[in-house]
A protein has these predicted regions:
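Surface-exposed loop/turn motifs in large extracellular/passenger domains
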Residues: 1-34, 40-64, 70-89, 95-117, ...
């Protein structure tokens, strides 16, 4: 059940300590505005925020779940797993406000519901090698990778899933110079997507992107 008022944020292993790497967070109860595995807001020489894991199960309620977030640096190899849960708005493997998102992963399974967006990686610059898997679950919009400058080699796999809006393997929205290349979407096993499906979508250039279907109901 999504609460009407969100509580405080949860950081790192203990809920209060912001760490750039090595967090392993598992929550099966509680009410949080945002849950972050790794987190960093260092402006000068920011470290990479990498190899953090967040798992949400049970009755844990949260508005935002992010494997890792950095205001200024790269986010790499972070993972979020949602199992049997209903969440408020955003699930992101790794997000950055100024740099690159590389090889971050999201798994949504076991009849979970995400009321808004799911993204493997979100970046102001480049989003590369990020993945999303949705298995017997639902979401509004799904992005394998969402980058400002480029999205390359990202993927989305949906099996017995329901998507109320659109699916993007890779998405890039910089007006002046953006590209989406070699991204993939696979829709299979009776899934339903109500909106559009893009292997790759960019303001400027989209090349070698792929969408595959197998046993899709609608």
């Amino acid at each position: 059940v999504v609460p009407s008022a969100w509580a405080a944020n949860y950081y790192g292993n203990d809920g209060v300590t912001k760490v750039p790497t090595g967090a392993n967070v598992t929550l099966n109860s509680g009410n949080y505005d945002a849950v972050y595995g790794g987190y960093d807001d260092t402006e000068v020489s920011p470290p990479e925020v990498f190899k953090n894991n967040v798992t949400i199960t049970g009755t844990a309620a949260t508005n935002i779940v992010c494997g890792a977030y950095s205001f200024y640096g790269n986010v790499r190899e972070n993972t979020v797993t949602i199992s049997g849960n209903t969440l408020g708005n955003v699930v992101c493997g790794g997000g950055t406000g100024a740099a690159d998102a590389i090889k971050n992963h999201v798994i949504i399974k076991a009849n979970s519901v995400v009321n808004a967006n799911v993204a493997g990686g979100v970046a102001v610059k480049n989003s590369e090698g990020n993945t999303v898997m949705i298995i017997k679950s639902s979401a509004a919009n799904v992005y394998g990778g969402n980058g400002g400058t480029s999205s390359k080699g990202n993927s989305v796999e949906i099996s017995e899933g329901t998507i109320s809006n659109s699916v993007y393997g890779g998405y890039a929205d910089n007006d002046n110079n953006s590209s989406a290349e070699k991204n993939n979407v696979t829709i299979s096993a009776g899934s339903k997507v109500s909106g559009s499906i893009y292997g790759g979508c960019a303001i400027q250039n989209a090349n070698e992107n792929k969408v595959s279907f197998s046993n899709v109901a609608e």
